[in-house]
């Protein structure tokens, strides 16, 4: 009986911890800077946030003339993408009035407009990037994608 309990405790002990991968602050900053640069090149003043896989802010940048609301909204977009494991453009469609998931729009910090994207590599969620301030979520999405593209070669894909 004691051998059985010992073997069972070994199985549980093996599952008591896990390892995750995270973006370094330098990598998060590079993504944010690239997203900001893309929006600037397109003539948009925005804020960019990069959050870790838990939704905690790693980097927040606001361009000179970006609106006062943009930093918080950029963080919320990144947080939403990470929290729901879905890019915010996809959530916008899935949570429209009359859709089964419409109620989640009432969750504090939930952002149901484009501009929040997951940062993934090798099948793992590493974090999220949110952009706010360009006219329309589609323009925010373009800038967020530029931020991810800027770090793609540095991410571990295996």
Where are the predicted features?
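Bacterial N-terminal signal peptides
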Residues: 1-10
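Flexible, solvent-exposed loop/hinge segments and secondary-structure transition points
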Residues: 13-158
């Amino acid at each position: 009986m004691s051998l059985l309990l010992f073997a069972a405790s070994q199985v549980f002990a093996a599952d008591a911890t896990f390892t995750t991968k995270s973006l370094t602050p330098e990598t998060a900053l590079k993504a944010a800077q690239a997203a900001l640069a893309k929006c600037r090149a397109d003539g948009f003043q925005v804020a960019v946030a990069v959050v870790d896989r838990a939704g905690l802010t790693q980097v927040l940048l606001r361009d000179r003339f970006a609106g006062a609301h943009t930093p918080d909204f950029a963080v919320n977009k990144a947080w939403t993408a990470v929290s729901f494991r879905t890019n915010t453009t996809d959530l916008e469609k899935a949570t429209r009035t009359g859709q089964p998931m419409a109620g989640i729009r009432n969750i504090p910090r939930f952002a149901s407009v484009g501009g929040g994207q997951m940062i993934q590599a090798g099948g793992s969620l590493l974090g999220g990037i949110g952009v706010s301030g360009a006219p329309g979520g589609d323009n925010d999405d373009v800038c967020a994608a530029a931020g991810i593209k800027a770090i793609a070669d540095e991410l571990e894909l295996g």
